[in-house]
Design a protein with these regions (language model features):
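Structured-RNA-binding interfaces characteristic of tRNA pseudouridine synthases
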Residues: 1-261
Length: 261
């Protein structure tokens, strides 16, 4: 038996999320990968992912793993899957790893990027990949708010509504914001995230950028542990799973890069 780790990228616009769903719910990343790999490995394949992205969310660096008794050379897997996957899902890398390696247990953190287009007139070329916010945003206030969210906190206020109870205490290592030509990219690096947490962070930062809430309110909002204290969840299309970290060296390098911006 062999254990294979994949790096997978996808445009989530027309996908029903990562996790496999009934066929009538639409194409999912997990479902499409299992179908393609079962064909090229000539046996039923079950795949495990590191992050269950929602419908409409994109990924540049999703991590998956599967076990197979098939003999296909690992370096051939990315090319072999092309004919069997939708055009919006691509396997960019495949490597053989120890049998006990699991995607959700052998990583040190994740980076998400949420993109906003902040101009009155929409950009039709990018609307699949950002949230269009027409009113001018105070980016400096958003940066200050990002810094206030860094650290280890109970993020119950920023979780999705009506979600399964899980440990709400997470650590955000860094939040950075880049602004160029109307595009605002919010990078969030942490040890893990609650359902809708990054999109709710983006929504909160936009509310602060619009003056609806203030940076000074953040400690109070977190202490309330009440999802109803913040505004709407930012739309899915602006979110990208940018990277998943296998090593602390790479994690620390990205954190330092964000903090130096």
């Amino acid at each position: 038996m062999r254990n294979i780790r994949l790096i997978v990228a996808y445009d989530g616009t027309d996908l029903a999320g990562y996790q496999k769903q009934p066929a009538d719910k639409g194409i999912t990343v997990q479902g499409a990968l299992e179908k393609a790999l079962s064909i090229i490995c000539a046996e039923p394949i079950q795949i495990y992912g590191a992050s269950r992205t929602d419908a409409g969310v994109h990924a540049r660096f999703q991590v998956c793993a599967f076990q197979t008794s098939g003999s296909i050379p690992v370096e051939n897997i990315p090319r072999a899957t092309i004919a069997h996957l939708p055009k919006d899902i691509v396997v960019t890398e495949a490597v053989e790893i120890p049998l006990d390696w699991k995607p959700r247990h052998n990583i040190f953190g994740k980076e998400y990027i949420y993109s906003i287009y902040n101009r009155e007139i929409a950009d039709p070329m990018g609307q699949r990949y950002h949230w269009h916010v027409k009113k001018p945003l105070d980016v400096e206030a958003m940066r200050q708010a990002g810094k206030a969210l860094e650290g280890k906190h109970d993020f119950s206020t920023l979780k999705g509504a009506n979600t399964t109870p899980v440990d709400p205490v997470k650590t955000i290592y860094a939040i950075g914001i880049k602004e160029k030509a109307g595009r605002i990219d919010i990078s969030v690096v942490g040890d893990g995230f609650l359902y809708h947490m990054v999109r709710n962070i983006a929504g909160l930062l936009v509310d602060i950028g619009l003056g609806r809430k203030s940076v000074a309110q953040i400690p109070e909002l977190l202490a309330a542990k009440d999802r109803k204290r913040i505004g709407k969840t930012a739309p899915a299309q602006g979110l990208v799973l940018e990277e998943i970290f296998f090593t602390t060296d790479r994690l620390h390098a990205v954190i330092e890069c964000i903090k130096e911006e």
